[in-house]
Amino acid sequence: MLSFYKTDENGVLCQVDKVCRGCWVSAVEPDEKEQAFLQTEMGIVPEFVRASLDAQETSYIDKNEETGQILVIVDYPEQDHESARKMTSYITLPVGVILLEGCIVTIANQSNTTVEMLESGKIKDLDTRYKTRFLLQVLLLISQEYLAYLRQIEKQSTQIEQRLYKSMKNRELIHMLELDKSLV
C-alpha cells in the first residue's frame, strides 16, 4: 500500500493524494503495480526497491551515482509470531529509506511499528521537508524499539534464571537458550 504524507505550514503531518515536493511516500507491502509506480513514476532505482523488500537484507547504505539517490537499509526488531516456541522470540526485518531529490520514501515488506508511529503523526517535530532529520527520527524510533525488546529479554532472562536455580531442569535451560538466540 502506498501512502503520501506532507508536513503542512503549521508543522502537522497530513496525508496528501499524490507525490509532491517535500513529501514522504510510505510503501508497506507494495504490490507489483505499486513497485512499478515507485520505479517508473518516481524514478527510484529498481535495485533499491528490491533490496528494501528483501527480508534477508542487513543494514547498509548505498548511493546511486547516476541519480544521486541514497538508500539506507535498517533492520528493525519485530516479535516472531511464526515461531513455534512457547516463549516470545524476536527477529529483525529491513526497512528501506530512500532519499530522493524532492522527497523521502520508506519501503517495508510488512507493516511495522516504526512506520505506524510515523504515520500516526505523534512523533514530535516530524517534518517531511527535512530528509536528514526525518531519517534520524526513523533511526531513533528503531533504536527505541530495540531497547524496549532488550528490556523484555532481560526481564525474561532473569525470571528463567531464578526458576533455573530452583529446578535445574532441562526445560529451563532450553528456555534460556531460546532467549539467547533472540540476542543474535
Predicted regions and their residues:
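Peripheral, non-transmembrane regulatory/ligand-interaction domains of membrane transport proteins
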Residues: 1-184
